[in-house]
C-alpha cells in the first residue's frame, strides 16, 4: 500500500513552489473525477509497470487479471487513493504546508525502508499521469498543475529514498 501512497507523491504542492489556489483547484477537481476508480487506477499502474506490482508481496508474480477483482486488491487500492486524496485536499493552502510536508516525508521514509527507488516513483508518476490524461478533461493548464504538484512531491520524497 505504502508504495502507492507514493501516488500521493503526485499531488502535493506545498514546497519550493507551492501550488496557487487555481492550480490546486485544477488538481483537486481532476482528481475528484477519478478518485472513485481506485481499482482501475492501481490496475493501470501495475499494467504499465509490473515491477511496481512486484513490490507488493501479496501481488508479486501474480497475473493482474486474477487479482484485480479481489478484496485484497480493492482494499489496497483504496488505501493508496485515500492517501492521495488527503494530500490533494490539503494542497493549495499555505497553512497546510507543514501537514503536507509531514505526510510526504513519511511516505519517502516508509518507501526507503521497502527498497523503492526514485525511478519507481517516476514510473508511478508516468502511469498516474497517463491514467489522468485518459480519464479527465486534460489541457495544458491541468497538465501544468499536476506537473508542478508532482515536482513538489518529488522534491520531498526523492532525497529521503
UniProtKB/Swiss-Prot annotation:
Residue ranges of domain Globin in the record: 18-161
Molecular function terms from GO: heme binding; metal ion binding; oxygen binding; oxygen carrier activity
Pfam families per record: Globin (PF00042)
InterPro entries: Erythrocruorin (IPR002336), Globin (IPR000971), Globin-like_sf (IPR009050), Globin/Proto (IPR012292), Mb-like_M (IPR044399)
GO cellular component annotations of the record: extracellular region; hemoglobin complex
Highest rank taxon of the organism: Eukaryota
Key words, A-Z: Heme, Iron, Metal-binding, Oxygen transport, Signal, Transport
CDD domains, alphabetized: Mb-like
Positions that bind heme b: 76, 111
Cleavable signal peptide: 1-16
Family membership: Belongs to the globin family.
Oligomer and partners: Homodimer.
Miscellaneous: There are at least 12 different components in Midge globin. There are at least nine genes for VIIB variants.
Name of the protein described by the UniProt record: Globin CTT-VIIB-10
Species assigned in the record: Chironomus thummi thummi
Amino acid at each position: 500500500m505504502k508504495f502507492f501512497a507514493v501516488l500521493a507523491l503526485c499531488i502535493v504542492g506545498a514546497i519550493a513552489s507551492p501550488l496557487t489556489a487555481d492550480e490546486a483547484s485544477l488538481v483537486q477537481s481532476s482528481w475528484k473525477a477519478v478518485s472513485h476508480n481506485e481499482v482501475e487506477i492501481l490496475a493501470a499502474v501495475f499494467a504499465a509497470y509490473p515491477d511496481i506490482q512486484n513490490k507488493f508481496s501479496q501481488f508479486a508474480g501474480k497475473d493482474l487479471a486474477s487479482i484485480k477483482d479481489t478484496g485484497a486488491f480493492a482494499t489496497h487500492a483504496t488505501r493508496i487513493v485515500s492517501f492521495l486524496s488527503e494530500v490533494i485536499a490539503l494542497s493549495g493552502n499555505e497553512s497546510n504546508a507543514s501537514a503536507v510536508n509531514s505526510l510526504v516525508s513519511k511516505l519517502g521514509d516508509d518507501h526507503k525502508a521497502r527498497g523503492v527507488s526514485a525511478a519507481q516513483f517516476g514510473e508511478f508518476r508516468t502511469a498516474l499521469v497517463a491514467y489522468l490524461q485518459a480519464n479527465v478533461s486534460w489541457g495544458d493548464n491541468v497538465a501544468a498543475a499536476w506537473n508542478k504538484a508532482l515536482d513538489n512531491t518529488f522534491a520531498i520524497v526523492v532525497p529521503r529514498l
